[in-house]
A protein has these predicted regions:
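Interdomain signal-transducing alpha-helical coiled-coil linkers
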Residues: 1-9, 18, 22
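Catalytic NTP-binding/metal-coordinating core of nucleotidyl cyclase/transferase enzymes
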Residues: 6, 10-14, 26-110
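Alpha-helical scaffold within the catalytic cores of cyclic-nucleotide enzymes
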Residues: 66-84, 100-136, 140, 160-173, ...
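Cytosolic regulatory/linker segments at or just downstream of nucleotide-handling modules
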Residues: 143-145, 171-219
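Short, surface-exposed loop/helix-turn segments at secondary-structure junctions
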Residues: 148-159
């Protein structure tokens, strides 16, 4: 009986760590069943593939999933390299965060380096034999994070900062990193100097109005 219980516990831990961030899985395994955290400053990342719907029309379902899996595996590898937490993928979109659930003081710097590596890798990637272009949006601000679901757990983020990052992505330029002034200020503070960027002036963001934004320059 004890062996069965131990095996079940091992399987439960394996399942949770595959679904949730390590820190969150550990808390749930210790009996914490309502996880809701708040962090005042994190960096949130969104990206998507430009014209993906048209690209997908020329792929079989098997080829489409195979290509997406290969492509997002690059993201996952780079996220691990830079200490970025993947939140989810939705179709061709990728959402990630730095600064929660593990608090770090250099979340903007980590995210900037991650985004630059993503742009470089994406330029070299071919989807169904064709090169792709992506948009990236990044914002720094406060979020609420937690686990929802009874049988199928999901770790997610909520807050205005999430919406802003998403809007920055959708209004971005091809193969560029579209950032908010809040992210630029956080990055400048963490670098000790202002990074190279190009002002986009005031960008109209849906449900937010005009916001000063920038394109972060590649190294």
């Amino acid at each position: 009986m004890h062996q069965i219980e131990r095996a079940a516990a091992v399987e439960q831990k394996k399942l949770l760590t595959n679904l949730l961030p390590h820190e969150i899985a550990e808390r749930m395994l210790k009996g914490e069943n309502r996880i809701a955290d708040e962090e005042e400053s994190v960096s949130i990342f969104f990206s998507d593939i430009i014209g993906f719907t048209a690209i997908a029309k020329h792929c079989s379902p098997v080829d489409l999933l195979s290509e997406l899996d290969e492509y997002f595996s690059i993201y996952d590898t780079l996220a691990l390299k830079h200490g970025i937490e993947k939140i989810k993928t939705i179709g061709d979109a990728y959402m990630a965060v730095c600064g929660i659930p593990k608090k770090v003081d250099d979340h903007a710097l980590r995210m900037a380096n991650f985004a630059k590596d993503i742009v470089k890798a994406s330029k070299e990637f071919t989807f169904n034999g064709k090169h792709i272009e992506i948009r990236i949006g990044i914002h720094s601000g406060p979020v609420i994070a937690g686990v929802i679901g009874l049988q199928k757990f999901a770790y997610d983020l909520w807050g205005d900062a999430v919406n802003i990052a998403s809007r920055l992505e959708s209004t971005g330029k091809p193969n560029s990193i579209h950032i908010s002034n809040d992210f630029l200020e956080s990055l400048t503070k963490q670098m000790g100097e202002q990074p190279a960027s190009v002002s986009m002036g005031e960008t109209m963001l849906k449900n937010r109005g005009a916001m000063q934004t920038y394109l972060l320059q590649m190294d």
